[in-house]
């Protein structure tokens, strides 16, 4: 198992053990999605249909069961960069939701479904990041630097749009 697969497996365990926080009773997927690293330009086109500050994205439509793909920008290092790892976790939560057909109520609008999915992913992402900040502080006696985004939507930093510039080759 390579380092990225090992990280993904550990994030699966973390997600599984924290689902109660968001009142979810998901079955753990018995496989991992393919994680494909693509250029920022390509990911922007896929995720936003125009240039946008996206780092990671799990498309919830047109996935083939057992062959799901999660996208991250080339150069992003979820193994060594906590900020990128939290984005990966957020996108993996969407994979779990997709795997479990979460929020598939025919009476709900796409906006309602999107909001519920994002809310659940945000809560788990923030909890994970907070735990990691605490672990880092206990281990080093220092605050984690640089601080990660406070809010990520569509795999991008909402509160600090310039944050992504360090990951995008211009």
Regions inferred by a protein language model and the residue ranges of each:
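A metal-dependent hydrolase signature that marks the N-terminal structural subdomain at the beginning
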Residues: 1-59, 156-158, 162-163, 170
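Active-site scaffold of zinc-dependent metalloenzymes
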Residues: 46-82, 92-99
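Sec-exported extracytoplasmic/periplasmic mature domains
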Residues: 20, 93-101, 126-133
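Surface-exposed patches in mature extracellular/periplasmic domains of secreted proteins
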Residues: 22-33, 102-114, 133-144
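Long, well-structured alpha-helical subdomains associated
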Residues: 126-170
